[in-house]
């Protein structure tokens, strides 16, 4: 489903064909709305090594909004612009607003995750709670990857070898601000409109910083040992 291709919505009344091949997910009927619109979050994990497993949750990300207001009514399932928040699918919609100014992270159809969390939080305490839930989701995601053997292909990698990698995953907040995991992005997109390039630029700078800090620390440990 790269780029949102193949996404469709169906009611329970419509049976799934026996020869169907694909992924079926339950629909979250009470998504958290901002200015009446549904959104999803793109979150990131930075992996530095696999043996031992060393991963970091990046405290920022990208939020994408559906172009039309979330107003349940008869026949609304057929209108993907209400439900689908994928920018690639909605890029030609008249309501999509993609800003040229990358410094603006709280306007248009794409936001930064930090201003989004601030917007939906009543106070600092609630903001911290949401970030904690996002972190717990990321931690659970890493454990799921481990349980499903995602890292088994790295068994031939020497211990302590640095293999920097960014993995993205999408999540959604419901009206109770509960986090719902949606999908994994093994090779998340790096460029885009609005604040995407600025945010992803910061992400990769963080990746390089963590990588080189780790290399420097290893070299320092080696020099200290040899001394």
PLM region descriptions:
Residues 1-166, 174-180, 194-227:
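Catalytic core of tubulin tyrosine ligase-like
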Residues 185-194:
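Glycine-rich phosphate/pyrophosphate-binding beta-alpha loops
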């Amino acid at each position: 489903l790269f780029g949102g291709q193949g996404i469709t919505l169906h009611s329970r009344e419509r049976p799934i064909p026996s020869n169907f091949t694909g992924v079926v997910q339950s629909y979250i009927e009470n998504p958290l709305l901002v200015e009446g619109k549904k959104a999803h979050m793109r979150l990131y994990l930075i992996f530095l090594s696999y043996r031992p497993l060393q991963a970091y949750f990046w405290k920022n990300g990208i939020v994408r909004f559906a172009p039309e207001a979330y107003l349940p009514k008869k026949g609304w399932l057929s209108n993907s612009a209400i439900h689908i928040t994928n920018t690639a699918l909605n890029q030609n919609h008249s309501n999509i607003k993609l800003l040229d100014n990358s410094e603006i992270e709280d306007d248009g159809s794409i936001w930064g995750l930090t201003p989004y969390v601030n917007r939906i939080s009543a106070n600092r305490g609630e903001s911290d709670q949401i970030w904690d839930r996002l972190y717990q989701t990321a931690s659970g995601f890493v454990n799921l990857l481990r349980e499903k053997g995602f890292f088994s292909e790295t068994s031939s990698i020497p211990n302590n070898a640095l293999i920097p990698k960014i993995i993205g995953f999408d999540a959604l907040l419901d009206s109770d601000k509960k986090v719902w995991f949606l999908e994994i992005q093994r090779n998340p997109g790096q460029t885009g409109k609005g604040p995407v390039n600025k945010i992803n630029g910061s992400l990769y700078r963080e990746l390089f910083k963590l990588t080189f800090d780790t290399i420097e620390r290893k070299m320092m440990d080696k020099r200290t040992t040899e001394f």
